């Protein structure tokens, strides 16, 4: 069964791309009777507030017609930012050699929170080097992953 996030990605990719943006990813956070839908958009030249407003109007129109979420929710549209969330194998692959933190559904090496360097991505498996040790994590075991920004 597809998750609500995967259904939303399928539903919103074309409308967002029609505006010239890339749909970077979606987070749907259920919080009681009111939920949050975060839509991350990206562009090779960056994203500004006007881009977010334009994409928000487009996404809102699609959501009103398709109505995939039956409860109240707040729509947030933004760029992925410097500590960008990672959603796909392609995105993890693009950040090989970068430091990341991942929250897991099931523990790996006794931990659900890992912080290390992405070593490789093979299919749906991520290798992350944590304290000099390579750990292999299935991408579907990652609840949340983010690049750690360097300043």
UniProtKB/Swiss-Prot annotation:
Q: Which UniProt keywords apply?
A: Cytoplasm, Ribosome biogenesis
Keyword presence, Cytoplasm = yes
Keyword Cytoplasm listed? The answer is yes
**InterPro entries from the xrefs?**
Ribosome_maturation_RimP, RimP_C, RimP_C_sf, RimP_N, RimP_N_sf
The superkingdom listed in its UniProt entry is Bacteria
What is a single cellular component term in the Gene Ontology annotation?
cytosol
| Cellular localization per UniProt | Cytoplasm
Check the record and name the CDD domains matching this protein. YlxS_C
Q: What does the record list as GO biological process? A: ribosomal small subunit assembly; translation
The entry assigns this protein to a family as follows: Belongs to the RimP family.
Q: How is this protein named in the record?
A: Ribosome maturation factor RimP
Q: Which organism is it from?
A: Shewanella frigidimarina (strain NCIMB 400)
